[in-house]
Amino acid sequence: MEWTEERAAALREARCVVVKVGSAVLTTETGVNLAVIDSLAAQLSALQESGKRVVLVSSGAVAAGRSALRDCCEIAGMPHKQAASAVGQSRLMHHYDEAFARYGHLSAQVLLTRDDLRNRERFLNARNTFQALLDWGVIPVVNENDTVAVQELKFGDNDCLASLLLNVVEGDLYVNLTSASGVYADNPQTNPEAGILPCIEDVHTLDLDVMCGGKTSVGTGGMYSKLLAASRAAQLGVPTLILPGREPRILERAFSGEPVGTWVRPEARVVSRRKYWLAYQSEPSGTVTVDEGAARALLQQGGSLLPGGVCDVSGAFEPGALVRIAGPDGTVIAVGLSNYGDRDLVRIKGHRRHEVAAILGDAHFPEVVHRDNMLLDAVV
C-alpha cells in the first residue's frame, strides 16, 4: 500500500487517537494561549463525536506556572521548576475544563510518573482507569507529575510519555502537534531552504543529529525527541502524524485528507505490547556487550543471549533489571531483562553452560536474557 493510501486509511479508521501538544504550541511569553486551547478542545471534541476515542497529552504546566509567578518569584533549579508546575498545572487544567465544557465534553486530569508505568500492577491499574474514562466519553488530559517526579523516574519529556501511553490505552494513531510545519529534510536553523518531508519510511535511516535542532526554549524536547517517540510508536505498529500545531483547524484539516505535516510509517514487524512494556518501562541500568556471533544469533536467528556471547559488562544492576545489549562496535541492538546481576555476569561472561554451573552452582539460568524478555532494535 502506498503511504498516501495508508495515511488516509489510518486517519479514517483509527479507534483511539493519542494527541500530544507541546509548550511551544500552547504558551506564549505571557502565559497560556487560551485561543489555542479552545481550538484544540473544539477539534478533539469533533474527533470524539466522529466515533474515535481521544487522549490528550499536554505540556504547559511549568510555563503556565512561570507566567503566574513572574512578578513575585525567581524560578531557578529543579525544586523551583517542580513548584512552578504545581502552580501552573491547576491553571492549565482549569482552562481545559472550561474549553471542553463549551463543546459539551468532560475532561479528566491524569498525572503520571515513569514509576506508574514500569510497575506492572500500577500499569494495569492505569490502563483500567483510562478504559473507564474512555468508556464514559471523557477526554483524559495527561501530563507528567513534575511536582513529585525525581530525575530517575522522569519520562524525560512528554513525547516519551505519549509513546508509552500508546501501550496503556491501546492507541492506534499518534498525532504530535509541534511548533514546526513538520519534519524538515535538513536542519532549518542552518539550512533555510530545507523542505518538509511528507513521509518517513523508517526513522532509523535518518541522521537525526544533522536534521534536528536543539531543544525549544519553553519545552524539554525538540524534533529529535519527537522522532524518537515516533520510532517507538512504529515498533508497536502505530503510525505518527507530526503536525504544525499553531495552524488553524490543523487536526480537522488533517483528518479531512489535507496533506499537511509529516507521516511516519509503522514498522512491518510489530512487537507485542508486553515486550514494548518490558523495553520501555524504565531506563536501562547497564550495558552488556556481546561478540559478533552472539549479535548475529540475536538479530538474525531470534535467539536468547547466552553467557558465552558476553564479552563486557558495564553499570551496576540486580537480577531482573533492564539492560542494553550492544554489539562489538558499541551499537545498541536490543534491550532486555537480565537474569543476572552485574557481579555474577562479570564472573560468567564468555563461559559455556557447564562452566557457569561450576562457577555459580546449580541455581543459575541458561540464558543471560531470554528472547521472550528482549526487544531488538529498541530505541533507548
Swiss-Prot record:
Name the catalysed reactions. Answer: L-glutamate + ATP = L-glutamyl 5-phosphate + ADP
- Specify the enzyme's EC class, one word: transferase
Q: In which pathway does it act?
A: Amino-acid biosynthesis; L-proline biosynthesis; L-glutamate 5-semialdehyde from L-glutamate: step 1/2
Q: Name one GO cellular component term.
A: cytosol
For this protein, what is the EC number? 2.7.2.11
**Family, similarity comment:** Belongs to the glutamate 5-kinase family.
Residues where substrate binds: S59, D146, N158
Q: What is its main location?
A: cytoplasm
Example of a GO biological process term: L-proline biosynthetic process
Q: Which GO terms describe its molecular function?
A: ATP binding; glutamate 5-kinase activity; RNA binding
Task: Write down the Pfam families for this protein, in alphabetical order.
Answer: AA_kinase, PUA
Binding-site positions, ATP: K20, T220, G221, G222, M223, Y224, S225, K226
Which key words are in the record? Amino-acid biosynthesis, ATP-binding, Cytoplasm, Kinase, Nucleotide-binding, Proline biosynthesis, Transferase
**Per the database record, which ranges form the PUA domain?**
285-363
Q: Which residues cross the membrane?
A: none
Q: Give the originating organism.
A: Nitratidesulfovibrio vulgaris (strain ATCC 29579 / DSM 644 / CCUG 34227 / NCIMB 8303 / VKM B-1760 / Hildenborough)
Name of the featured protein: Glutamate 5-kinase
- Where found, per UniProt? Cytoplasm
Its biological purpose is as follows: Catalyzes the transfer of a phosphate group to glutamate to form L-glutamate 5-phosphate.
